[in-house]
């Protein structure tokens, strides 16, 4: 099975890290994967998105035009990518920052209070981890344990408090939808 994922939001929300973690988790599970970041203004607050493909077989192209799953962290990204998700696909959106509902009725919609939960954990910077935890639990493209292992690799060298907040945020996201 091949699954195409789009992560999108503002620069500084950890969008690229989300994609890296999904891709690394998939590799850790012995699957084929591609990771393709795209940036708007190259600064905090500009737009950022990335696409990830996870497959049991080799992947011909890293381009994702019609994702099966969209992990959306802000309103402009929902406006831009809502229409691109395949019918029957999934849209996870950060309802802490997005004040409208998903308009489509032909996709599964998961509302994630990512920033609210991240602040409860200790830092709004972990909102991306909340979203990843919800995605892992609900869709199962990669296992939560694989994402946590990838997190340890990607954030190696960070202080233990930051690591623990990110782990806890991911687990809380999974609990939210579990």
Map each language-model feature to its residues.
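Active-site cofactor/cluster-binding pocket
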Residues: 1-178
